[in-house]
């Protein structure tokens, strides 16, 4: 049996995978227009899922058990179990308190989505991207959220995680003189 979180962190801690799969992010340069960076980042995550043997789906809706619409940016389905094994949210982070709150909301989406899938996913990934130098997100807040659970906006109790790995990934872009963004650093670490 393979250590899936370690495989993911290995692939998403260097630029090698992205250089090979999505050079627009790391060597061609990309403009920060509309949702282009988001689309490319989600595509990169889907590509990694495919390379690791999963059926990767973009914007996959989770079962509607509590009334709120949630779609993970990338969902990796096990081809043998036919259930989601990995859920990913990819979000811009600007280094502000508002940005931290947005990442926390995305983490809550992952936790609730996992619950709605019957706790089938073995890995949840919160992936943030930023341009230029910004303050680092407070990862302790994320770990605490996973350990304590929360009450959703519609009143559903989302329990703490058990037997699920949580990874935090960062795509760090530099702003070039031309105004384009180039991915210069990637980080991936296990929170739980």
Residue spans of the language-model regions?
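Active-site beta-strand-loop-beta-strand hairpin of nuclease catalytic cores
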Residues: 75-87, 117
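Domain-level recognition of nuclease-like catalytic cores that cleave nucleotide substrates
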Residues: 126-192
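Short, well-structured alpha-helical interface segments that form or flank functional binding sites
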Residues: 36, 40, 44, 67-69, ...
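Acidic/glycine-enriched edge-of-secondary-structure segments
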Residues: 55-69, 82-102
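Acidic-basic catalytic patches of nuclease active cores, encompassing PD-(D/E)XK
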Residues: 1-63
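Catalytic cores of nucleic-acid endonucleases
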Residues: 93-150
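Core alpha/beta structural scaffold of self-assembling particle/tube/pore-forming proteins
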Residues: 73-76, 110
């Amino acid at each position: 049996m393979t250590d899936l979180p370690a495989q993911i962190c290995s692939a998403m801690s260097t630029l090698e995978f992205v250089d090979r799969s999505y050079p627009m992010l790391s060597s061609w340069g990309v403009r920060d227009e509309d949702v282009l960076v988001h689309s490319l980042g989600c595509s990169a995550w889907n590509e990694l899922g495919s390379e690791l043997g999963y059926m990767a789906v973009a914007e996959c809706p989770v079962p509607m058990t509590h009334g709120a619409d949630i779609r993970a940016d990338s969902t990796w389905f096990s081809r043998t179990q036919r259930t989601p094994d990995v859920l990913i949210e990819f979000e811009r982070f600007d280094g502000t308190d508002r940005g931290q709150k947005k990442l926390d909301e995305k983490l809550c989406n992952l936790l609730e989505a996992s619950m709605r899938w019957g706790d089938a996913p073995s890995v949840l990934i919160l992936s943030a991207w930023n341009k230029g130098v910004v303050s680092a997100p407070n990862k302790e807040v994320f770990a605490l959220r996973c350990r304590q659970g929360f009450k959703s906006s519609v009143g559903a109790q989302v329990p703490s995680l058990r037997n699920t790995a949580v990874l935090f990934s960062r795509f760090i872009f530099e702003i070039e003189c031309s105004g384009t963004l180039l991915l210069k650093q990637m980080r991936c670490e296990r929170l739980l």
